[in-house]
Amino acid sequence: MKIDVITNAILDSCEPKIHPNVTLQILDDKTVIVVEIQPAPMRPYYIKSQGIVKGTYVRVAGTTRHVEEYMLKELILEGQNRYYDSEICKYLTEVHDNEIEKLCRDMKAIVIKNTLDESAKLAVRDITKNVLITWGVLKDVDGKILPTNAYALLTGQMLRQPVIQCAVFKGNTRAYFIDRREFDGPVQQQVEFAYQYVLEKINMGMHIKGIYRQDMYELPVDGIRELIANAVAHRSYLEPGNI
């Protein structure tokens, strides 16, 4: 009976409908009600009586909080199998072929620059308009090429283009700045500038092997680049603020 009450309460209170698996288990000689709810794509799920804005909650560490506006938008897009970066940019009404070609050249140049093996550099293929469409950077709508939010980010034309903020602090706290820099422009350019900034600020040593000297940074440079790139690639651009 209790299981039916819990199941019906969840079904009646939530929207879209949630179908929980409610069971009884024995733990330390006590009967425990276990409620299992599998992840589902129809996000967001909210308390029906409170509405989608006030009734959507998220878990933050060990607390339950009302969802923030940007996160609610993100959940709605995910529930529709859509993503912010692949949405058509609302304030870039058109894009010209010369702008697309420049972005394609710039992106290929970045790939070649970060490819160490010479044979691999020669194997790098051209990036074309069709490739950008496949990636979701551009969209073909009834024969018209439209820019997405990803295109705006890659060309530095986002309405509130986020920036990367880098700083060096004195000691082990963030109370005093020794140096601070802010990098704007296209996101891929920001990654490169932030990477070079970190290399300027960390110590470099050397390793002698035989008659050869190899310069070595105190931190692994591949890890630094990946850390910065991941911060840019995996952040939510619906969330206001910088990196």
Stretches found by the model and what they are:
Residues 1-243:
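Conserved N-terminal catalytic/coupling substructures associated with nucleotide/phosphate chemistry
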